[in-house]
């Protein structure tokens, strides 16, 4: 199968199973696996939308504990003896009586060879019905009137998008934090917490008059509906929409006076602590979202990230590198503890920032990272970027159910040839040990199960594996055996039912050492994304230069192992088609905002890394290596062009998509024509059409993206053009002149090496056999 056909085949599997593997054949020994350089890994999107997939309305057939593997197309079924053999533990299990008519031609859906992914709606049985989803809005009132009004309007609109039975609560904060008692209709009533004081969970519960609703010994059983006292603060939308709207509309700016040389006192930590404490009491393990809307940094109480005085700047990357950080470590510890509490209780924390300055996202990032919450960084709540992104959180499916799952867990089972080493994504470990757990650790490891409080159809996870076989005389025969992995995702559907989605993936094991089909099974796109996740995971704990050196070392080793070359002859270096783009991906990854913090604030870095760890292969690749399209009068429609400074031409329009920004760039001549108004004159309809085409294409790109990208239109030489220039390969710089003799392309003033120079060095090092 040629590379293009293979790529289409892998894309079809991704559409069906929501999974892409770095290697589509597994090495048969640990020694062989270590020589692959890139680990065996999967980018898995558990809730990928599949409109044609059946939803089975019965409980799955499972293997005996402790295995609990689910019946799947890779299981051996003996229809005469009415048994099936689990591929993971090789145990024989009886088929249930309703499967008595099973035969080679009559198979239940879960055994059909194409149903490698199947979803069950689990019967409720004796379990109590889960409570409806809960939304607690935590609103910052220390902001300008227009920004607060825009936020209030967005919140009022969101009420109409919630399921009628959803419970809603409101907490506002400035100098003090206030919990609004929506259930009290005589007048506006709220409980006030001092912003400078740290409250223990027990104190919050006592002050709000909430009795301990659940015994700690029952962590996995959701509670029945809203428990008495909590019903004063959390009410169903259909019952209390009028009261909630009223409270929101009457919200005023924080009345505390702010001197010109001071920041407003903002007790973000106390407000979040109260929200977590309120839900922890009565709604443990119930689907809930705490949605924080903040327009500035915490300056008061626990979790403060910057002082009250404006002359004291908020920390930068430079300050963190030099350890010049007064509040950072204490704030991180405070928010991390709160994130662990929220994750333990099954509650999601979303952070929406509407501010030109930093708000402390770096310190708070694990609130979203541990709980599967959204993170959004915008300049203001008045921006369309915030309004449209916020509304998209409440997108619904064809049955009018919210496209979000609550309280999910993901468990991985493997056959004896494979072991799972860890997961990188928005989850926390459930510390579950099994025979599938590997000896090494990559990401969140030493477990085969993880908890995701929030999960949506785009949530993707990088899951990493190692080979268990030591090799030797008993090594497997090629083509006779498959390594199989099963992913079990339990979650609370927004309709209130519990669902289980099962994906089972099997791949052949390679033959003896040096099997050429192993190299042909390499998916360079999935591999680039899996390596990017590891690099970002390392960047959170290691120094930036160390991470870049690791990326370079891995790339040199991979090329040294899989390229064709004569030793010490760089001109003989050749890569197979399914490896050729990988060095380019790594070149752009090491220049990207994920690993280069220059020109980005710590908050922006936290935001970009958060989004990378949420998206699937296609979207992650756009972030790593943006796409560039060119429009000109010579060609109809768009032409994909190289992400290179040579692509900038005076008579062309460029459309750049970096996932976070969508930019339309007018070449010098095009900009002059536009300013002269040619597009409005008769006879120049072609220029008008040329100017409109990229806008149409940009609208299509924006249509279903979350978070909504920033849209920029600029001209050659304009200040906004820097967004484009920073992403291009600098093949023409002030030191090189026109690379390849071209004089029309843009000169980029940078000391960064070009892709050509990078590749020259890579080939030289790869053929010399040194890393």
UniProtKB/Swiss-Prot annotation:
| One Gene Ontology CC term in the entry | endoplasmic reticulum exit site
Binding-site list for Zn(2+): 63, 67, 86, 89
* Stored SUPFAM superfamilies: beta-sandwich domain of Sec23/24, C-terminal, gelsolin-like domain of Sec23/24, Helical domain of Sec23/24, vWA-like, Zn-finger domain of Sec23/24
Q: Which UniProt keywords apply?
A: Cytoplasm, Cytoplasmic vesicle, Endoplasmic reticulum, ER-Golgi transport, Golgi apparatus, Membrane, Metal-binding, Protein transport, Transport, Zinc
Gene3D superfamilies found in the cross-reference section: beta-sandwich domain of Sec23/24, Sec23/Sec24 helical domain, Severin, von Willebrand factor, type A domain, Zn-finger domain of Sec23/24
Which branch of life, at top level? Eukaryota
Identify its membrane topology class: Peripheral membrane protein
> Where is it predominantly found?
cytoplasm
Q: Does the keyword Metal-binding apply?
A: yes
InterPro entries in the cross-refs:
ADF-H/Gelsolin-like_dom_sf (IPR029006), Gelsolin-like_dom (IPR007123), Gelsolin-like_dom_sf (IPR036180), Sec23 (IPR037364), Sec23/24_helical_dom (IPR006900), Sec23/24_helical_dom_sf (IPR036175), Sec23/24_trunk_dom (IPR006896), Sec23_24_beta_S (IPR012990)
Pfam families for this protein: Gelsolin, Sec23_BS, Sec23_helical, Sec23_trunk, zf-Sec23_Sec24
Q: What is the annotated localization of this protein? A: Cytoplasm; Cytoplasmic vesicle, COPII-coated vesicle membrane; Endoplasmic reticulum membrane; Golgi apparatus membrane
Molecular function per GO: GTPase activator activity; zinc ion binding
Its quaternary structure? The COPII coat is composed of at least 5 proteins: the sec23/24 complex, the sec13/31 complex, and the protein sar1.
Q: Which PANTHER family match?
A: PROTEIN TRANSPORT PROTEIN SEC23
Q: What does this protein do?
A: Component of the coat protein complex II (COPII) which promotes the formation of transport vesicles from the endoplasmic reticulum (ER). The coat has two main functions, the physical deformation of the endoplasmic reticulum membrane into vesicles and the selection of cargo molecules.
Membership in a protein family: Belongs to the SEC23/SEC24 family. SEC23 subfamily.
Provide the protein name.
Protein transport protein sec23
Tell me the classification of the organism that encodes this protein: Eukaryota, Fungi, Dikarya, Ascomycota, Pezizomycotina
């Amino acid at each position: 199968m040629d590379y293009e056909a293979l790529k289409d085949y892998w894309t079809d599997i991704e559409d069906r199973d929501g999974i892409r593997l770095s290697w589509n054949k597994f090495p048969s020994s640990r020694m062989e696996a270590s020589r692959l350089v890139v680990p065996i890994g999967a980018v898995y999107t558990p809730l990928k939308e599949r409109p044609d997939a059946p939803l089975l309305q019965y409980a799955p057939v499972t293997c005996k504990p402790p295995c609990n593997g689910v019946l799947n197309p890779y299981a051996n079924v003996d229809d005469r003896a009415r048994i099936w053999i689990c591929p993971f533990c090789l145990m024989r299990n009886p088929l249930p009586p309703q499967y008595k008519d099973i035969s080679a031609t009559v198979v239940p859906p879960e055994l059909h060879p194409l149903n490698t992914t199947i979803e069950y709606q689990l019967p409720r049985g004796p379990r109590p019905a889960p409570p409806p989803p809960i939304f607690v809005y935590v609103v910052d009132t220390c902001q300008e009137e227009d920004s607060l009004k825009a936020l209030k309007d967005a919140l009022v609109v969101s009420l109409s998008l919630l399921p009628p039975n959803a419970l809603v609560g409101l907490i506002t904060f400035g100098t003090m934090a206030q919990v609004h008692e929506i259930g009290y209709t005589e007048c506006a009533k709220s409980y006030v917490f001092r912003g400078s004081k740290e409250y223990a969970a027990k104190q919050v519960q006592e002050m709000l008059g909430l009795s301990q609703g659940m015994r700690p010994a029952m962590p996995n059983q959701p509670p029945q509906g809203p428990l008495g006292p909590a019903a004063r603060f959390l009410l169903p939308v259909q019952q209390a929409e009028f009261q909630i709207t009223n409270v929101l509309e009457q919200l005023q700016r924080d009345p505390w006076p702010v001197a010109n040389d001071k920041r407003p006192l903002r007790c973000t930590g106390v407000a979040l602590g109260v929200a977590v404490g309120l839900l922890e009491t009565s709604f443990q393990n119930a689907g809930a979202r705490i949605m924080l809307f903040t327009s500035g940094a915490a300056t008061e109480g626990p979790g403060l990230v910057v002082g009250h005085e404006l002359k004291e700047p908020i920390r930068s990357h430079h300050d963190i590198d030099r350890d010049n950080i007064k509040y950072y470590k204490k704030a991180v510890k405070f928010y991390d503890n709160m994130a662990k509490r929220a994750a333990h209780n099954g509650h999601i924390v979303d952070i929406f920032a509407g501010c030109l300055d930093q708000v402390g996202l770096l310190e708070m990032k694990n609130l979203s990272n541990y709980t599967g919450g959204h993170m959004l960084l915008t300049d203001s709540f008045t921006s369309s970027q915030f309004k449209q992104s916020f509304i998209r959180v409440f997108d619904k499916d064809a049955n009018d159910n919210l496209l979000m799952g609550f309280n999910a867990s993901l468990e991985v089972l493997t056959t004896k040839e494979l072991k799972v080493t860890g997961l990188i994504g928005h989850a926390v470990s459930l510390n579950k040990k099994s025979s599938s757990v590997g000896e090494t650790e990559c990401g969140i490891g030493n477990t085969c199960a993880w908890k995701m409080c929030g999960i949506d159809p785009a949530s993707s996870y990088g899951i990493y594996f190692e080979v268990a076989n030591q090799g030797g005389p008993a090594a497997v025969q090629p083509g006779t055996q498959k390594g199989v992995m099963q992913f079990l995702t339990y979650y609370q559907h927004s309709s209130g039912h519990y669902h289980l989605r099962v994906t089972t993936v099997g791949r052949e094991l390679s033959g003896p050492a040096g099997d050429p089909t192993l190299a042909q099974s390499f998916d360079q796109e999935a591999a680039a994304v899996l390596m990017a996740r590891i690099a970002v995971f390392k960047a959170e704990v290691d120094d930036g230069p160390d991470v870049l050196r690791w990326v370079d070392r891995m790339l040199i080793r991979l090329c040294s192992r899989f390229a064709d070359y004569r030793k010490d002859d760089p001109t003989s270096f050749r890569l197979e088609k399914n490896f050729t783009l990988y060095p380019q991906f790594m070149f752009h990854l090491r220049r990207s905002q994920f690993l280069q913090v220059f020109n980005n604030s710590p908050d922006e870095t936290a935001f970009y890394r958060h989004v990378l760890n949420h998206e699937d292969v296609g979207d992650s690749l756009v972030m790593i290596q943006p796409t560039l399209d060119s429009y000109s009068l010579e060609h109809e429609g768009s032409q994909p062009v190289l992400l290179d400074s040579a692509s900038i031409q005076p008579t062309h329009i460029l459309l750049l998509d970096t996932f976070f920004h969508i930019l339309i760039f007018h070449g010098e001549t095009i900009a002059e024509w536009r300013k002269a108004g040619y597009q409005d004159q008769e006879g120049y309809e072609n220029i008008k059409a040329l100017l409109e085409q990229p806008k149409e294409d940009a609208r299509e790109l924006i249509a279903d993206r979350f978070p909504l990208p920033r849209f920029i239109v600029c001209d050659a030489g304009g200040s906004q053009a820097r967004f484009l220039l920073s992403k291009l390969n600098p093949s023409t710089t002030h030191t090189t002149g026109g690379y390849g003799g071209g004089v029309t392309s843009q000169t980029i003033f940078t000391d960064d090496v070009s892709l050509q120079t990078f590749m020259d060095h890579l080939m030289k090092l790869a053929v010399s056999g040194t890393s």
